[in-house]
Amino acid sequence: MLIRDNKIPVVQMRFMNNLALINITGRDKPGLTALVTSILSEMDVTILDIGQAVIHDYLNLGILTELTDVTQEPLQGIRAAIEKAGLSININKVDEHRYTQWVQQQGRRRTILTLLSRKIKASHVSAVSVMIAEHGLNIDKITRLSGRIPLAGSEKKTRACVEFSLRGEPPAEFRENLMALAGKLDVDIAVQEDGIFRRHRRLIAFDMDSTLIDTEVIDELAVVAGVGSQVSAITELAMTGHLDFHESLCQRVSLLKGLSVQAMAEIAERLPLTEGVEVLFSALKMLGYKTAIISGGFTYFGDNLKARLGVDYVYANELEVVDAKLTGEVVRPVIDAKAKADILSELARKEGIAMEQTIAVGDGANDLEMLAAAGLGIAYHAKAIVREKSDHAISRLGLDSILFLLGISDREHDNH
């Protein structure tokens, strides 16, 4: 609604029953909601529903009411009092049949759609909204979860997230179509049921290489050992699912024979964390999460991250060492894709946590079973085969954007 020259738009009142939707807009200031409801209380109004939002200091307040007196006199009284406060008001009738339908829809499934990008453009929201409508869903609410974005901020450092609360039953193809749209728009889109477990997860497990750290440790070891190109080629085949993980691991480790523990220590000290890791772990600790590294990588480096980040559990493969040098062998048993999923399930049982309350995050083909087993599986900056087979993917933002999928806003985290 546009307000020009401080003039209040004319109120339209179409009224035949005692149900009315009152919309009030204007520049926000402390006490407005108290003022409005005080005015309504004098008319003996029952509030059936209420919602309020403030965007850039402008108030939009909606109140669904039941009035005991529906003559023009009290309505004009409400109008005059609201306008005297410098606000705009619009009163519309609500059909009793539609109201009854609204009540009966209570308890219907709701879905949360999370839209993430460095900056969110109108074209992004338009495309997503069109697809929501095309699949027969209705948007009940849109909420910004990310912090306020400075106009002069670098796009590489900014992040934006809005959350859509949807009403209705999503058709089977909804998620797949949204994932295709996300790729076209170069954004991330996550869809999940708005159930009791969404904000009550309790255990989160991470792959290590290319998830918690922005590198593949075995490739770093290979460079120092002088076999970088050979190992990188095998790693790529394994992570894209073109080579059995167990076989690829043994092949790569055999090429590291003779590498010193001292060289491993130097690599461990310079492991680069992925974007948002420290922010995420700070929030997870505050929320009381149990954290785990479940990796096909190596315990030596997992233990280093455990100390740096305060991780609760580390499960990874152990490199055999004799006389302070690698033998080129892996201590059995090897942690492969199945083992990862089994470890997650065992950890949940040990901690007394339902699998619906678990989260798994990974990027490679050997993470797929773990992602599928978790209550919330997230493919993080993952290979194409992993994104395609995962329900959720984050490819444009840092690891801390996982908090948005849990419904946690920047404001909530920053205030602690």
Where are these regions (language model features)?
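N-terminal amphipathic/basic-hydrophobic helices that include classical n-h-c signal peptides
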Residues: 1-15
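A conserved regulatory-domain signal marking ACT and ACT-like small-molecule sensing domains
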Residues: 14-201
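Short glycine/serine/threonine-rich phosphate/pyrophosphate-binding segments
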Residues: 32, 124-126, 212-215, 367-370
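Active-site neighborhood of HAD-like aspartate-dependent phosphohydrolases
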Residues: 196-246, 250
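Long, charge-rich alpha-helical interaction segments
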Residues: 237, 250-258, 268
